[in-house]
């Protein structure tokens, strides 16, 4: 998340080209040519002993002779000289360097050298970067690009060149175009942090092949996507493609889960990528998912409709008033419906009349206009008419409009006109629908991330007991636990299993069956045979002692014949579960090499191929995220919405997934968990067969997760001056209703001191941003008092750190009727201790001069107080290092 050096890379004031050349096709020549042609208005310093000047610019023989230190250096020499040149640049004080080429064998030394001098590196093997707003073309690309508001970050030079060529033909602009190369130092997460605050960037497109730090990526992407749409294309979905790219990219469903969790949108191929670029370049915010389609032919509209249905899209329904107006304005033979087919003899006037009526209505959220080549309404003429209608209509600048002028030659000019007018345009009906559904899915992802999670009922967790059981099993040398052994661990987290007993032989199996009652099931116990079905190691519905004895002996005999070396640890004996009307599910937790633990949900009783048969989520899960996973599974037909007799209990299954998530987050010893089958019967969920793989773990528990979980260890009970006890804890997404109630009990004056303006009401989005925080980037502590099985918030303090984790902005607010109890001071002390322990250097805040209570508290806590009467503010700064010393 560090931003150190990025300003010098992306907005350099001076550039040195190391290895500049006058020989065409040399890297140093191409880089100099592009820098000078791009219009960069700072000094460009060619460095080469071979030439006195390069392209008319005075050259310098070596780095030491440069008249001043450049912000950015670009290495265009033979890779064998990289280390020596980087050392010389570091000694000169250069802040950033682009390395165009370097073998893998140099990577460690290059990175060590850069860190020694606190220099940032882009690359190696980077195409470079383009920043049109700075007139900067520090790349090999000969293609000039226009200024725009779309930023593109790519891990592939080939894809970068393709996009550049495509964008030039369409005169599409960019704010930044950055080719990362091998991402030895500067990586995608840091660039996302930078671009999220860049005023010239309104949308971001990523091409990714791999990640070096999934946690940092998810954190940065989630933060950036709250304000700007981000689309991702990820290659290497198959193992074969991963081998070709020489990456260890992990499971593809894990990427889907991470992208959704961060609020991004994934596109699947280059065709969708180009549509996405068009959409992001001209997109207006989407209000909903209702689409209205206008066409001058039934067939193109039908193609669009088929694609919309295949993607679970939604058509708008026209009101009676709108239908009446359309009937009066259009010829009688036109059927008023959606899609609205104006027929192949439709003139430009028909399009204009239709648009005027629809734009005045509130019946749709997006409008798709299709035009097929027609003598009655030439493409260019119709495009002009549409553009003028949009410009003059009062709602024109607010409507989400997508245009599809079919054909190639006859529609080129029309598409150019749409691009100039800032209207997205596509070549095919299907491509237009794809672009629309991108917008819908992005909006859904963002909305889903901001939903307030429900508080799950009756969740239990006994972390200490689970840890003790796992540590005892590991100490005894166990690597895998079966259903009987894992029962107490699951019970510690409120997960129900079918009662299970162990029998060492057939006689003991009969004895247990007599005790628990028939019918029963027998299951083989062997650490050497993971799949019992391979030896028919599971026998069901055994109704008599004779059947149990025969089945037990048969299992033992089959193992001796098929697996003579296998260790046999007896049999599991279970009562037969009541499967009438029940649904069999499967819940698996696996460790992904990139994203860590994954929670997978699918149907039971099938061969397990997660890429095809499961939906995947990253822990930790709350009720919202778990419910979204279940609904996603139903929509994608990975699980059924009902059994033969009853519907699936979505809330109950969501709660079970939250319990599994809590278990995985709390217990890093768990390497893999397989609950199969999980029997869903009405509101009851019972694990019939469970396998748990375990291993010692002595690292940082949280570091293995792609999303930082709720930090339980920061909870603390505090006694106020009046003797009441309250809990100081990190804020939770579920706190939104209590936070709204808390704010209602704060006076307008106190709110004005806190927010520097009069606020009548906080929206759901405001409160979601306050409660659904990324604990890696900010912290908010709430003081809560528990009364009658409910919690009320008494005070809140918050700190938001910068990406470099140096400074943090703080704020504190206490309920107005509870002042004088020391609550504000205790909350601030809690926040100061946290930020200091988190490695931050300074804590900064502002208040008003007449907020005397806050100013006095700040002085008592050691803050430097800077009263700026002319500005009407008081600056508060605490040096955390000095605070630590004191």
Curated annotation (Swiss-Prot):
Activity regulation, short description: Exhibits positive cooperativity. It may be the result of acetyl-CoA binding to two distinct sites, or the result of subunit interactions.
CDD domains reported for this sequence: NAT_SF
Domain (N-acetyltransferase): residue spans on this chain: 726-881
Keywords: Acyltransferase, ATP-binding, Nucleotide-binding, Transferase
EC numbers for this chain: 2.3.1.-
Keyword Transmembrane part of the UniProt annotation: no
Keyword flag Translocase: no
Gene3D superfamilies per UniProt: 3.40.630.30, ATP-grasp fold, A domain, ATP-grasp fold, B domain, NAD(P)-binding Rossmann-like Domain, Succinyl-CoA synthetase domains
Effect of residue 450 to W: Almost loss of activity. Decreases helical content of the protein
Reactions this protein catalyses: L-lysyl-[protein] + acetyl-CoA = N(6)-acetyl-L-lysyl-[protein] + CoA + H(+)
Domain ATP-grasp: 487-523
Matches recorded under InterPro entries: Acyl_CoA_acyltransferase, ATP-grasp, ATP_grasp_subdomain_1, CoA-bd, GNAT_dom, NAD(P)-bd_dom_sf, Succ_CoA_lig_flav_dom, Succinyl-CoA_synth-like
Pfam families: Acetyltransf_1 (PF00583), ATP-grasp_5 (PF13549), CoA_binding_2 (PF13380), Succ_CoA_lig (PF13607)
Superkingdom classification of source: Bacteria
Binding site for ATP: 513-524
Function description: Acetylates and inactivates the acetyl-CoA synthase (Acs). Can also acetylate other central metabolic enzymes in response to environmental changes.
Subunit structure: Monomer in the absence of acetyl-CoA. Oligomerizes to a tetrameric form in the presence of acetyl-CoA.
Family affiliation: In the N-terminal section; belongs to the acetate CoA ligase alpha subunit family.
UniProt name for this protein: Peptidyl-lysine N-acetyltransferase Pat
Species per Swiss-Prot/TrEMBL record: Salmonella typhimurium (strain LT2 / SGSC1412 / ATCC 700720)
Gene giving rise to this polypeptide: pat
């Amino acid at each position: 998340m560090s931003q150190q050096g990025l300003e010098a890379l992306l907005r350099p004031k001076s550039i040195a080209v190391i290895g500049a050349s006058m020989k065409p096709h040399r890297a140093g020549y191409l880089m100099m040519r592009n820098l000078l042609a791009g219009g960069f208005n700072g000094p460009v310093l060619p460095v080469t002993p071979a030439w006195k000047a390069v392209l008319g610019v005075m050259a310098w023989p070596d780095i030491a002779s440069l008249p001043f230190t450049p912000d950015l250096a670009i290495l265009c020499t033979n890779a064998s000289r990289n280390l020596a040149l980087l050392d010389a640049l570091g000694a000169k004080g250069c802040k950033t360097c682009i390395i165009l080429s370097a073998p893998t064998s140099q990577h460690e030394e290059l990175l060590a050298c850069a860190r020694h001098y606190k220099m940032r590196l882009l690359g190696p093997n980077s195409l470079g970067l383009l920043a049109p707003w700075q007139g900067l073309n520090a790349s090999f690309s000969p293609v000039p690009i226009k200024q725009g508001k779309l930023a593109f970050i790519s891990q592939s030079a080939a894809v970068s060149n393709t996009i550049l060529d495509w964008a030039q033909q369409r005169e599409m602009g960019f704010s930044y175009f950055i080719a990362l190369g091998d991402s030895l130092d500067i990586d995608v997460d840091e660039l996302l942090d930078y671009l999220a605050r860049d005023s010239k960037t309104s949308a971001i497109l990523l091409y990714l092949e791999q990640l070096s730090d999934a946690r940092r990526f998810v954190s940065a992407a989630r933060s950036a996507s709250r304000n700007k749409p981000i689309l991702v294309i990820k290659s290497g979905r198959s193992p074969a493609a991963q081998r070709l790219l020489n990456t260890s990219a992990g499971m593809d469903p894990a990427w889907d889960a991470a992208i959704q969790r961060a609020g991004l949108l994934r596109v699947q191929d280059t065709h969708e990528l180009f549509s996405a670029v068009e959409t992001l370049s001209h997109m207006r915010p989407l209000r909903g998912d209702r689409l209205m389609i206008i066409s001058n032919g039934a067939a193109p509209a039908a193609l669009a409709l088929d694609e919309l249905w295949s993607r679970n899209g939604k058509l708008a329904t026209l009101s009676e008033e709108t239908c009446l107006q359309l009937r009066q304005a259009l010829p009688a033979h036109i059927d008023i419906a959606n899609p609205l087919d104006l027929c192949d003899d439709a003139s430009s006037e028909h399009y204009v009349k239709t648009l005027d009526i629809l734009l005045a209505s509130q019946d749709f959220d997006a409008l798709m206009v299709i035009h097929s080549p027609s003598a009655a309404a030439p493409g260019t003429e119709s495009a002009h008419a549409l553009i003028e209608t949009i410009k003059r209509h009062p709602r024109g600048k607010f409507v989400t409009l997508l245009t599809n002028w079919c054909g190639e030659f006859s529609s080129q000019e029309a598409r150019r006109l749409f691009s100039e007018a800032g209207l997205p345009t596509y070549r095919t009906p299907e491509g237009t629908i794809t672009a629309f559904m991108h917008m819908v899915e992005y909006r859904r992802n963002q909305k889903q991330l901001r939903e307030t999670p429900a508080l799950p009922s009756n969740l239990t967790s006994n972390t200490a007991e689970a840890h003790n059981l796992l540590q005892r099993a590991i100490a005894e040398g166990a690597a895998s636990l079966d259903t009987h052994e894992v029962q107490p661990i699951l019970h510690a987290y409120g997960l129900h299993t079918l009662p299970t007993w162990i029998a060492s032989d057939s006689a003991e199996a009969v004895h247990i069956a007599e005790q628990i009652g028939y019918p029963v099931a027998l299951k083989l116990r062997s650490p050497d045979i993971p799949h019992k079905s391979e030896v028919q190691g599971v026998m069901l519905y055994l109704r008599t002692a004779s059947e149990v004895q025969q089945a037990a002996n048969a299992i033992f005999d089959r193992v001796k014949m098929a697996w003579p070396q296998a260790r046999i640890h007896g049999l599991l004996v279970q009562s037969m579960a009541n499967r009438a009307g029940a649904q069999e599910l499967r819940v698996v937790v696996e460790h992904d090499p990139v994203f860590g633990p994954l929670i997978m949900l699918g149907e039971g009783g099938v061969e397990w191929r997660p890429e095809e048969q499961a939906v995947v989520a990253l822990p930790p899960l709350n009720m919202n995220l778990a419910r979204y996973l279940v609904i996603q599974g139903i929509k994608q037909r990975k699980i059924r919405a009902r059994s033969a007799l009853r519907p699936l209990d979505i809330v109950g299954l969501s709660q079970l997934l939250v319990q599994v998530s809590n278990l995985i987050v709390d217990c890093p010893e768990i390497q893999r968990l397989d609950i199969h089958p999980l029997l869903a019967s009405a509101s009851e969920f019972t694990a019939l067969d469970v396998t748990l793989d375990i291993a010692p773990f002595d690292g940082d528990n949280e570091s293995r997760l792609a999303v930082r979980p709720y930090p339980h260890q920061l909870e603390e009970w505090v006694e106020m001056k009046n003797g009441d006890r309250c809990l100081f804890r990190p804020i939770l997404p579920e706190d939104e209703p209590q936070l709204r109630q808390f704010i209602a009990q704060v006076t307008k004056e106190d709110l004005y001191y806190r927010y520097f303006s009069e606020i009548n009401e906080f929206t759901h989005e405001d409160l979601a941003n306050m409660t659904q925080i990324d604990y890696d980037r900010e912290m908010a502590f709430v003081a809560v008092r528990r009364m009658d099985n409910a919690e009320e918030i008494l005070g809140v303090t918050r700190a938001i750190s910068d990406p470099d984790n140096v400074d943090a902005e703080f704020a504190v607010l206490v309920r107005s009727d509870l002042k004088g109890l020391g609550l504000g001071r205790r909350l601030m002390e809690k926040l100061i201790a946290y930020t200091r322990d988190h490695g931050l250097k300074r804590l900064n805040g502002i208040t008003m001069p007449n907020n005397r209570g806050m100013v006095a508290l700040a002085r008592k806590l050691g803050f430097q107080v800077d009263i700026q009467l002319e500005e009407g503010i008081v600056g508060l700064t605490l040096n955390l290092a000095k605070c630590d010393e004191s």
